[in-house]
């Protein structure tokens, strides 16, 4: 059988960027993917001529010029700007929190008026915030918290905000200007034609096997390569030796609607506790689509169980301590490197995953 320099387990962005660098440096790569397609969570499906983000909305944004130039070398990006809207019991608010939000909520028009209201409400919390609720109120005040943070966050994490640690929300962007651009980054956009074009370029000249669980055939695949790049869950790699790390998962429900424009924006967050989903995505708006039909996806957060897709690491102290024990094992591996959101048990935006893979590749290939 053919022998490879690298066996890459998983085919998301981390594996893809590493594979691209490896091939550029004359190395051979075999990709082993459990799903029936490559691309990890940025994979898109074509439905009615619309590129549907199968695993939730992915909006590329970065301030790293090197990363931006790298992805633009793989695909052309459009000028999509993320400007989601929050729906609280039928009241519509612009996100992130800015003068449009404050004007709608309080009927005010100046930054000084908004600041005065928020500062007064923030003062309710004195001393170090003991939980997420106190942390959020200390950042944005009671009213914004109750309407636009509390319900959404509790659905996301499946717990009351008073039971969640304060560090989950380090900051909440508050802008005293009329600006609905969600991200502060220098660059943002969506690849024209969807993310699949990027994935295909990253894995060009690699051999690929889909529908294969590496962990069930570990000895076979280990024997096929000099080094394994493992981007699956690190606890599963070690057979849950110290116990299972916690993740949050997502469930999606999609519908094709016989209308041209359902909600007028790509993302609407539902911030009340009673609506069971956290948001509705209308995919065509990511690429300014004019198709006669539209595709909408409702997103439901769920607790992760084995066999489900792990999306978000639950980076509380208990899980971080458990991860550190697995990390110690990983450091002793001579022929296995761990990377990506699951391999490093870290919440990564796309640009940070690319940065991480670039760093690793440059350490190895120079």
Model regions: which residues?
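A short, Lys/Arg-enriched amphipathic alpha-helix followed by its capping loop at the start of a domain
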Residues: 18-27, 202-205
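N-terminal FAD cofactor-binding segment of flavoenzymes
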Residues: 57-91
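Beta1-alpha1 glycine-rich phosphate/pyrophosphate-binding loop at the start
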Residues: 36-52, 74, 140, 156, ...
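Active-site/ligand-binding neighborhood in enzyme catalytic cores
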Residues: 86-227, 231-235
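Glycine-rich FAD pyrophosphate-binding loop
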Residues: 9, 23-48
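Short, well-ordered alpha-helix to beta-strand connector turns
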Residues: 4, 26, 206, 224-226, ...
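Beta1/beta-strand and adjacent pyrophosphate-binding region of the FAD-binding site
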Residues: 1-14, 30
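C-terminal segments that line or cap access tunnels to active or ligand-binding sites in enzymes
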Residues: 226, 236-365
């Amino acid at each position: 059988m053919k022998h490879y320099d690298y066996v890459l387990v998983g085919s998301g962005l981390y594996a893809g960027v590493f594979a691209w660098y490896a091939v550029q440096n004359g190395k051979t790569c075999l990709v082993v993917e459990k799903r029936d397609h490559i691309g990890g969570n940025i994979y898109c499906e074509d439905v009615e001529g619309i590129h549907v983000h199968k695993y939730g909305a992915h909006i590329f944004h970065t301030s790293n010029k090197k990363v931006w130039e790298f992805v633009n070398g793989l695909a052309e990006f459009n000028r999509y700007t993320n400007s989601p809207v929050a729906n609280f019991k039928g009241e519509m608010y612009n996100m992130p929190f800015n003068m449009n939000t404050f004007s709608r909520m309080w009927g005010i028009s100046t930054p000084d008026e908004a600041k005065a209201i928020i500062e007064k409400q923030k003062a309710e919390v004195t001393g170090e915030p003991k939980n997420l609720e106190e942390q959020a109120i200390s950042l944005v005040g009671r009213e914004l918290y109750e309407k636009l943070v509390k319900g959404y966050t509790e659905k996301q994490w499946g717990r009351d905000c008073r039971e969640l640690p304060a560090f989950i929300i380090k900051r909440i962007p508050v802008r005293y200007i009329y600006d609905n651009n969600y991200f502060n980054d220098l660059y943002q956009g969506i690849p024209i034609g969807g993310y699949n074009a990027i994935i295909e370029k990253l894995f060009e000249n690699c051999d690929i096997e889909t529908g294969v669980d590496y962990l069930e055939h570990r000895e076979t695949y280990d024997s096929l390569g000099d080094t394994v790049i493992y981007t699956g869950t690190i606890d599963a790699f070690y057979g849950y030796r110290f116990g299972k790390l916690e993740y949050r998962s997502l469930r999606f429900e999609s519908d094709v609607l016989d209308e041209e424009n359902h909600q007028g924006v790509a993302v609407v967050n539902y911030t009340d506790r009673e609506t069971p989903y956290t948001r509705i995505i209308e995919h065509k708006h990511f690429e300014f689509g004019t198709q006669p039909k539209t595709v909408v996806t409702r997103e439901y957060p769920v607790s992760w169980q084995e066999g489900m897709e792990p999306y978000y690491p639950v980076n509380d102290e208990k899980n971080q301590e458990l991860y550190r024990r697995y990390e110690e094992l990983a450091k002793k591996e001579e022929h296995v490197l761990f990377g990506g959101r699951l391999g490093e048990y870290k919440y990564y935006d796309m640009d940070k995953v690319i940065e991480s893979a670039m760093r690793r590749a440059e350490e190895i290939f120079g």
